[in-house]
Amino acid sequence: MSDPMLDPITMRADWAEPDGVLANYVSLTDQLVEHVDPGTPFTLTVGGLVVDGELIPQWQWFAELSELNDHEDAYYVGMAEYVKELSDLAHTAVKKRDIGEEISFRQYQALSVPTRYIHLRDARISRPGQATGVTGRLWRGRLRDVSGWTPGRADA
């Protein structure tokens, strides 16, 4: 009988999952209900690129994106409102759960949504050996594509 941890299929499946610690940190950030300013500084390695910026909640990222064009893009405005509602539901559910109260089905669903993306403000994207990259952007990336990370900005 072979060791399941050495099975190539099991090993590939593990690599398809995002880093659990980073996913948990992002998930907790996404449940915040107040604007974050400044965000938590992070540096990520994604596909050979270095991406650094301030981690902000998903709903805030969509809200700031909609502000870039004076709320003229209904899609981003709608997404900001929808994601903010999910964040509010999850935040309320955590508070109720912590004091032993029952939560609604919608609150349970909001808590159960897996965190799949990370959202950065004032992001800078650069290649190894490049002095500076493109800065000041809102950046959204898949958590499972992050191969490494550290708290703080790359230039700090």
Predicted regions and their residues:
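Conserved RNA-binding domains used in RNP assembly and mRNA/RNA metabolism
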Residues: 2-156
